[in-house]
């Protein structure tokens, strides 16, 4: 599986969980929390801090783990904000082409 296919698959799962909630799903617990969009945003902040600390402290074994957590929670937050992943990818592509 390619890197982009893995991210696309993860995105598809997040979208599907929002459309078809699954009891006990972590994604659904974030998307349906009483705090609304604040819950996934709190997780983005938490995971960003953990990622920064892992990098700053040179904890190479934790950097990839924290980056994965951050990426996952960013995807959930994007979905909660009704922003499709394709818009983010288009923006990245546009920045790449402008070089």
Swiss-Prot record:
UniProt keywords, alphabetically? Amino-acid biosynthesis, ATP-binding, Cytoplasm, Histidine biosynthesis, Hydrolase, Nucleotide-binding
The record's section on Pfam families has: PRA-PH
Q: Where is this protein localized, as stated in its record?
A: Cytoplasm
What are the record's GO terms for cellular component? Answer: cytoplasm
Per the record, the pathway is: Amino-acid biosynthesis; L-histidine biosynthesis; L-histidine from 5-phospho-alpha-D-ribose 1-diphosphate: step 2/9
NCBIfam families per record: histidine_hisI
Q: What is this protein called?
A: Phosphoribosyl-ATP pyrophosphatase
The organism is Methanosphaerula palustris (strain ATCC BAA-1556 / DSM 19958 / E1-9c)
């Amino acid at each position: 599986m390619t890197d982009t296919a893995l991210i696309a698959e993860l995105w598809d799962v997040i979208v599907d969980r929002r459309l078809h909630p699954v009891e006990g799903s972590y994604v659904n617990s974030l998307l349906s929390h009483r705090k609304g969009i604040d819950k996934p945003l709190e997780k983005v902040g938490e995971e960003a801090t953990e990622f920064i600390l892992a990098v700053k402290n040179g904890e190479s074994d934790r950097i990839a783990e924290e980056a994965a957590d951050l990426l996952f929670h960013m995807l959930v937050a994007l979905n909660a904000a009704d922003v499709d992943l394709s818009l983010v990818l288009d923006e990245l592509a546009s920045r790449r082409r402008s070089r």
